[in-house]
Design a protein with these regions (language model features):
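A short, structured surface patch at a secondary-structure boundary
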Residues: 46, 52-100
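Proline-aspartate-enriched helix->loop->beta-strand connector
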Residues: 105-111, 127, 239, 244-245
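Extracytoplasmic substrate-binding proteins
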Residues: 121-195, 284, 289-309
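Structured C-terminal subdomain patch of bacterial secreted/periplasmic proteins
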Residues: 146, 242-309
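Short helix-initiation/N-cap motifs at beta->coil->alpha
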Residues: 33-35, 90-98, 226-236
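Alpha-helical, coiled-coil/dimerization segments enriched in small aliphatic residues
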Residues: 72-77, 202-231
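N-terminal signal peptide c-region/cleavage motif recognized by signal peptidases
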Residues: 20-24
Length: 309
């Protein structure tokens, strides 16, 4: 009887192990992009990121890609997270070096709208996940957050992705409270960029800038309908009626000295009231974590301006 009992135990354990291994053998990672579902037997290890927003997203998830385009440009304009020197540079975002990409033998290629026409060729090298953003029909911030979750799933980093998104929401509220310490709500603030001393880029309602401003409790005195890339170019005289608003302009702007010497600029109501300040350089076309960098820069600029009130 003991022998039979032992045999039954062994058979039961063997059956359990067989089911366990069969289940895990078929456990796949499935993610969805603009073209549908894609399945992977395991989290990709050799990753090529073809756009800066995607590069930022994967680095924020502690995934180091093997290659990305125009890394000097990324380090100048995007900055955070830092792109390690070990990442191979594969040319430009619009025309990445396909031969070099193929030689690196990636497990997955992450692409965005600048590479859409290359997808048939890229698919011959490795599976492609297509994550476009910044079209007229995209709410850019929400799309960046959705892509962050998609990449978290792809790389088995879902818990980290959710942790960082929770921290993002918490930081928005903390920064909003910091601003309220110095200013009463509602606070009218225009966050913009300069093209020339006479031309400005205004953030549209689908831009990351507008999303961040709303999260901080700021009200835009000029509202623009959604557009591709989240900006509308306009003449500087569009700002001449901002009597009770604050104006923040994002760096860099090489002609800043020329602007400040301009009689037209000096005549602006917000300039006369010392309600204008610069914002340190932040990237408006990044991933989910760029929203936090933008919020921090806007908050710091407003607080720097507060003692003058």
């Amino acid at each position: 009887m003991r022998i039979i009992a032992r045999l039954l135990t062994v058979v039961t354990q063997s059956a359990f192990l067989l089911v366990f291994f069969m289940t895990n053998a078929h456990a796949v990672i499935t993610v969805t992009d603009e073209y549908g579902e894609h399945s992977f037997e395991q989290a990709p290890q050799r990753v090529v990121a073809l756009n800066w927003d995607i590069l930022e997203q994967v680095l924020a998830l502690n995934v180091e890609p093997i290659a990305a385009p125009n890394l000097p440009g990324y380090r100048q304009w995007v900055v955070n997270p830092t792109a390690p020197e070990s990442i191979e540079d594969i040319g430009t975002r619009a025309e990445p070096n396909l031969e070099k990409i193929a030689s690196l033998k990636p497990d997955v290629i992450l692409a965005a709208s600048p590479q859409q026409d290359l997808i048939p060729l890229l698919k011959q090298i490795a599976p492609v996940i297509y994550l476009p953003n910044f079209s007229e029909n995209e709410a850019a911030a929400e799309t960046a957050i959705r892509h962050f979750r998609t990449l978290g799933k792809l790389f088995n980093k879902e818990a980290l992705a959710e942790q960082k998104l929770t921290q993002l929401d918490t930081s928005f509220e903390q920064m909003r409270q910091r601003i309220r310490h110095y200013y009463s709500e509602p606070l009218s603030v225009l966050v913009m960029r300069f093209s020339t001393p006479n031309t400005v880029f205004l953030a549209t309602e689908n831009s990351t800038t507008d999303y961040v401003a709303r999260k901080l409790g700021l009200h835009a005195p000029i509202k623009e309908a959604p557009r591709a890339w989240g900006v509308k170019q306009d003449r500087i005289n569009r700002l001449q009626n901002l009597q009770n608003s604050y104006v923040l302009y994002v760096q860099p702007f090489p002609e800043e000295r020329k602007l400040k010497d301009s009689p037209l600029w000096q005549a602006m109501p917000f300039v006369k009231k010392q309600r204008v300040n610069s914002v340190r350089a932040v990237w408006a076309y990044g991933g989910a974590m760029s929203l936090q960098y933008t919020a921090e820069a806007i908050t710091d600029s407003l607080i720097e301006l507060a003692p003058k009130q």
